[in-house]
Amino acid sequence: LKCHKLVPPVWKTCPEGKNLCYKMFMVSTSTVPVKRGCIDVCPKDSALVKYVCCSTDKCN
């Protein structure tokens, strides 16, 4: 699986076990992603951050 890093079109190949791509947003400004990459489990939302995940190449 290949996931975008913080700024597309830069991407990286995910390590084994982290087979989801994610975008992380601050809940207060949920329009601009603050982080992108590979993640093992989703969703992982909290009071401050929201994760949007997917399982196909470069879909974040």
From Swiss-Prot:
Q: Where is the protein situated, by its record's location annotation?
A: Secreted; Target cell membrane
Q: What else is known?
A: Shows very weak hemolytic activity.
Q: Which sequence ranges form a coiled-coil region, renumbered to this chain?
A: none
Question: Subunit structure, per the record?
Answer: Monomer in solution; Homodimer and oligomer in the presence of negatively charged lipids forming a pore with a size ranging between 20 and 30 Angstroms.
**Protein's name according to its UniProt entry:** Cytotoxin 1
Keyword Nuclease attributed: no
Q: Which CDD domains match?
A: TFP_snake_toxin
> A Gene Ontology MF term for this entry?
toxin activity
What intrachain disulfides are recorded?
Answer: C3-C21, C14-C38, C42-C53, C54-C59
